[in-house]
Each structure stands twice: as C-alpha cells, then as structure tokens.
Amino acid sequence: MHSNGFFLKDVAGFLGGYYTFIAIMNGVAALILWRRKNQPGWAMVWSIVAGLTMVLAGLALSGSASLVPSLPLSVRMLVNKLSGPVLYTLGTTALFTVLFVFRKFFVKPMVAWTVLNVLLVLMGFSMADENFASIVMKPDNVPIVGLVFMLAFFTWVATSQAVVNDERIAQGLPPMEKLNDEKVLVWPDLVYTELICMVAVSAFLLVWAIVLQAPLEEPASSVKTPNPSKAPWYFLGLQEMLVYFDPWYAGVVLPSMVVFGLMAMPYLDFNKKGNGYYSIEERKFSYLVYQFGFFELWITLIILGTFLRGPNWNFFGPFEYWTPYKVEVLNNVDLPQMFWVNLLDRPLPRAPQGAGMLTQVGTILLREAPGLVLLGAYLVLLPPLLAVTVFRKFFAKMGFVRYMIMANLMLLMLTLPLKMILRWTLNLKYIVSIPEFSLNF
C-alpha cells in the first residue's frame, strides 16, 4: 500500500477529470432547461451545482490530503462497522420496496437527476479512500460500476413510461405507445441507426481497451491460487449462492429452474393486458416477482461478490482493507442436530455397525425426518394452501397445472432468501444433510 499522500497524488488527475465531467453534465442540463424546457429556476440550480463541482475538481487536482474532498474517517469507519451480508440484503430489499412504493415521485426527471448527482458526488468522495478506490477502480470491476448506473437508468426510463401509461389508462386514454404506432422501414432507417450505433460502440470499446490496463493474467498454477478466487462477474451470483447451498442445487438446479421459468412464462401468463406497452398497475404481480428475482436475487449478489467479498470469501466493508488474515467465527449447525441433539437432547440416530442397506436408509430417513417433513410441507402443502387464500384468483384463472408450476417455481426462487435468513438468524447450514450420498439442502 502507498501512503495516503502518495495515493492522493496518483488519483488526483482522475478525480479532477471526474468532477469536471459532473460539472459539464450539469452545465449541459442547465442549458437544455433554460433554452428548450423554459425552466430558468432549475437551470439556475444546476448551474450552481456545476460551479460547485468545478470547485471540487480544483481541490481534487491539488492532491493534498487536506484539500481533496473525502468522507470523514468516522463515517467510513461507521460504514465498515455496519456492513455485513444481513444489512446489505435487508438494505437493498428496503431500497427496492421504497422505490416501488414511491415510484411516481422518483421517476420525476428533476428528482432522478438529483439522486444521480448525489450518488456521483458520494462516489467521488469515496474514491479519495485508498481501499475503496483499489476495488472500484480495478479494471476488471469498472464494467460492474457501469452496470449499476446503466441498470438504474434503463429501469428509470421503463418505470417512468409505465407510470405515464398507468395514469393515462386510469383516465380512459390509450397508452403512449398507441399514439405513435407508425411503422418505420428497415431500410434505410433502422439499418442506418444500427450502423451508427455499431461504429460508436466500436470506437468506445477501442478507447476503453487502450485506457484501461487489463492484460491477461499469468497461466494458472496449482501451487499458486489467487485469494480471493472469484468466478467471472456473471457467475458471481452463483458463487455467492454456494455459501448457502451445495453445488448441485446452487449451480445446477436453481439456474435450470430460472431457464425453465423464463421459457414457461408465456404459457403461464393469463393476463391479456400490458402487452406491447409499459405498465405496472396492469401487471403488478409479474412486475414485482421479476424485479425481485432479477435485482435482489441476481444483480445485488453480483455487486456483493465483486465489491464486498474479499480474501477467503470474507465480507469486507467498502472502506476496509482486504487482509487475508481476517478470521470470522462460524458455528453453523444442521437441522437434524438442532432437532435431535439441541431440542430432544438425544444423539443423532445411527445405524448399527454392519447393518444392511435397508436399515441404513431407514436410519437416514429417521435422522432427516424433520427436514424432509419441512420441505414436504413447503413444496407440497403450501401451494394448495396459497391457492385457497392469497392466490385464489390466480388458481381460478390458471387452472391446476399452470398454477402448480407457477407456485413451485416461485417457492423454489424463495428458497434462496429463506435459506439466507435461516443462516443469519439460526446459524442453520443444512435443512437436510445426507453426507452418505453427498446430498445436502
């Protein structure tokens, strides 16, 4: 590690350019609001913000520890202390809920622009910390930072259009897509647009490859493994799931169920509304399930694995140094042990020495009875119970087969957050543990 002074001098040029970019971005926004939108008040606000960020750029270019804008040490230490998988997951879930409930507020352009500026400035302040910058500015991780902002942008675009359409439909008006349904010729309109995009993206990738130094790593060696040893970014969600499940389930069953669910979705859908245009009110259940599965159970796991999982796959705060000597005490137990040993104060059932196959299988079934009963109730009894309560209308419209497929796919999806909660609250490792056949759940 460098000393903080040397680090700030190294990163000063980048931070100066970063704040200058924010200033130009707000200056352009102020010009558009003044000339085209006739909103001089907001134009003045963003002009002031542009001026303030130029001041931040000048301070950052100084490279001085006393002048470079940064978060106070007490704030960084508090963030590190509060950081953890539990708070991270609960926080992202709460954020997802707030954004959904108050979506009509957050889709307003000025609100979204304000949130973007706050996030960009906070990131600039955070990058004055060497530990944070070493993770975020790593060439392999830069695309993930872009992924976060691009996902936020496109989600905002889709949600804002859905809010407008929902308001129009409530007023008895057609959605916006119906007002502009003029067909466009593939040649030359579409092809020219795609050609321009192809050239622009190719030029961007060329500059990216030149500026970001990310050469191929040295050949793999069995005597020298990287720590942390991470999968490619698109598999980090699977690697995070391996913390809570065996490979056969986290790496095979769950991904297969995702693919199967996506293929089955058109055949399970009975709602004829919301096709061909953005809408949330007409497809609220589908929207919530998909967004929760995509963002909460996939994207947030990728972000967690990229930025917050360090050596030995331990969890580190965003401003914490990644030391390989960090030790976390784990005291995970299986459900059979909790039931037989902790609850009944009896040893785990064991087959007698030299017992036959049937006796061994019977003993295993007896030992794992609590977990098997629990899983059976979850996957077999819960769907019919939901059919006569929460999903009564769904069952009436979908029929038995389609409803059971939908219900079981949803329950399998929920096994991930449920298992995570059980690990955090009860230190539960496996609900069913059959090491004799390498079968654990």
Residue locations for each model-derived region?
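Hydrophobic cores of alpha-helical transmembrane segments in multi-pass integral membrane proteins
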Residues: G13-P69, N80-E130, V142-N165, P188-N275, ...
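Soluble extramembrane regions of membrane proteins in the secretory/endomembrane system
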Residues: H2-F7, L73-L78, A133-P139, R168-L173
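Short membrane-interface loop/juxtamembrane segments of multi-pass integral membrane proteins
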Residues: K178-K183, F235-G237
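Extended, regular secondary-structure scaffolds
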Residues: I144-L147, I169-N180
